[in-house]
Amino acid sequence: GGLPLAAMMPTEEQKAQYLDQLFRETYIMDIIARNKVRQTQELEDIIDVLASSVGALTNPTKLQATFQSKLKSKISLNTLRHYIEYLCDAFLIHEAKRYDVKGRKYIGTPLKYYFEDVGLRNARLNFRQVEETHLMENVLYNELRLRGFNVDVGTVQKRTMDSAAGKRVSTSLEIDFVANQGRKRYYIQSAFRLPDEEKVRQEKASLLALHDSFKKIIVVKDAIKPRTDDDGILTLGLYDFLLNDDCLEW
């Protein structure tokens, strides 16, 4: 996480205890008191569900279905929306909207929620679900916002030939992040690893479907030498991205 006091603590146990206590005794209690929350268990369940699905497309309606099927809760859609707003207002989570790049418009739902601090997210789940792929995506999102970018989740339509049907079909491809700052724009894919050519092709597909001049970037976990391929796509390592504010211009 990015909380200064946690970073200064000498042991992992102390850090975990501090984050857990901060979540329970400060964030949760403040949200409940400030917003006069009556369904406190449902509020905590919402936090758990969102913490478990960082980087996944969702919306209040899908969350309500999860509550009804798995938690046997009858929470109303309106209450669920309000509770999510409370979490955003408390700077626990942040909403990333979907943006249709070619259509130049926002798509209402589904959308994504990222945690403002991944340490708090991990503490909430007792450090059990520490999937590096999802956490890396969350970290990239937070870092882009820290650098002053407006960050959306991108989508682009690609037309391909369906040989079986004998006609062209439209496929929706996701761009992890569309980062805007003034006249600047960057398309960024978070790829934990690129172990083979198939994975490379998969990550590049949405970027190659874009036909504008804005920079296209793939960030991987491994420490690699930054390189720009024949398609003009820059691939660089996570640590280079985090430690160099000018890396997007490489």
Residue ranges and their predicted role:
Residues 56-67:
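Short acidic, hydrophobic short linear motifs in intrinsically disordered regions
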Residues 48-52, 68, 145:
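Short, locally clustered residues in the helix-turn-helix/winged-helix DNA-binding domain
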Residues 40, 57, 74, 197-198:
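Loop/helix-junction capping segments adjacent to catalytic residues or to phosphate/diphosphate-binding pockets
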Residues 1-57:
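Interdomain motor-coupling "hinge/lid" segment immediately C-terminal to the ATP-binding subdomain
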Residues 31, 68-79:
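Short, positively charged loop/turn segments that connect secondary-structure elements
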Residues 1, 17-20, 40-44, 61, ...:
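Non-catalytic, well-ordered alpha-helical scaffold segments
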Residues 79-250:
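A cross-kingdom feature that marks ATP-driven nucleic-acid transaction machinery
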